[in-house]
Design a protein with these regions (language model features):
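C-terminal helical subdomain
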Residues: 178-179, 196-236
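Conserved glycine-rich cofactor-binding loop
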Residues: 11-13
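Substrate-binding pocket helix/loop in short-chain dehydrogenase/reductase
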Residues: 94-95, 99-104
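The beta1-alpha1 cofactor-binding region of Rossmann-like NAD(H)/NADP(H)-dependent oxidoreductases
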Residues: 37, 57-68, 100
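Residue(s) in the substrate-gating loop at a strand-loop-helix junction
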Residues: 138
């Protein structure tokens, strides 16, 4: 197992939590996100936790950005062992109010950027005898929600890509896993990062998802985790 990882969408939320977990475990990681200031803050946190970190600020929806991010990670780390496709966004509107721009933005980042990043890194994984891809989806990749038809459909699409990539890349020892978390206390969900103590009684925090991702990244050579669905514990 190569303890190096490329993590997208790492400037806050689940991506930040994943970066923290890998840093705590002593990995060398490359963090990618659009907001450079936030990204550098996360990098500092990771270093304080014991990880080695590189930062690449870019908008992954731009044509050349996914390939450039992969190239940067390879140049800095020499060999990438794990890709965590976490970058994503959501807009929540009733169907009569959906704008074309909203549809395009969500599919461009949540689907196209993930595909383009995998497309760029797959030859590197193949050359090095294998690798691990973790695609961060959502519980809404299994169901539909009111006002979330576009966001939900991007996560269904990502699951479809995940299934196809598993078939395509299996013979090259490249493992692919979809992680679909339920409600997590992040700014994406309109919450203060990590939530309040009261909120933590009923919802997940980024570290919960990070733990699952790390389990996938460190699985044994003879196991292949296909999919993880993480739901909030029902205490009723």
């Amino acid at each position: 197992m190569t303890k190096t990882a490329l993590i997208t969408g790492a400037s806050s939320g689940i991506g930040r939590g994943i970066a923290h977990k890998f840093g705590q475990e002593g990995w060398e990681i490359t963090l990618v996100a659009r907001r450079e200031k936030n990204l550098k803050n996360v990098a500092k946190e990771v270093e304080e936790l014991g990880g080695k970190v590189h930062v690449f600020a870019t908008d992954l929806t731009e044509k050349e950005s996914p390939g450039n991010a992969v190239k940067f990670a390879i140049e800095k780390m020499g060999k990438v062992g794990t890709l965590v496709n976490n970058a994503g966004m959501g807009r929540f509107e009733m169907v009569p109010d959906i704008k074309d721009e909203s549809y395009q933005e969500q599919f461009q980042l949540n689907v196209w950027a993930c595909m383009a990043t995998v497309r760029s890194i797959a030859p590197h994984f193949k050359k090095n005898g294998g690798g691990q891809i973790v695609n961060i989806g959502s519980i809404v990749g299994y169901l539909g929600i009111s006002k979330g038809s576009i966001y939900s459909s991007t996560k269904w699409a990502l699951r479809g890509l995940n299934e196809s990539w598993r078939e395509e890349l299996y013979s090259d020892n490249i493992k692919v896993c979809y992680v679909g978390p339920g409600f997590v206390l992040t700014e994406f969900n309109g919450r203060k990062e990590g939530g309040t103590p009261e909120e933590q009684e009923w919802a997940m925090v980024p570290g919960d998802v990070a733990h699952a991702v790390y389990c996938v990244a460190t699985q044994g050579p003879n196991s292949d985790i296909k999919e993880i669905s993480i739901q909030v514990l029902d205490r009723s």
